[in-house]
Amino acid sequence: MGYINYPNNVVREFFKQASKYGVDVLCVFNYLDYINNLKLFVDVSSSAGGFVEGTLSYTGDTSDPKKFKCNIDYYIKLTRDLSDMGVHYLAVKDTADILTPCVTTMLVSALRGVLPDMPLHMTFPGSCLSPRSW
């Protein structure tokens, strides 16, 4: 819908109309990974019979052991929380274009270890052309 907070009634009406016109998969995303903000979206979309893709915002180098917040355990916890919330798919969004092939392998392996059967999508808005990948 956008990068702002919407009143609950607007969210509900949006999904009612989206479902009516054939939208059946919704990607929910909070750029700060504050997944409590996604709960209403997941509930409304699921109750309308839709499928929900919960999206993690990749914002830190998980290969750096000095990272205290955005490490592998952080993303594993988010993955479990999204699954418990009821999402049907999982996505990792690399908005900062900082994922390298090595780190992507490490991250995907860790997420697969938690939810081996959940579909996993990767999004690279920067076309996966990070200078760190060269």
What is each residue range found by the language model?
Residues 1:
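Conserved thiamine diphosphate
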Residues 126-127:
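Extended, largely alpha-helical regulatory/partner-binding modules appended to the mid-to-C-terminal parts
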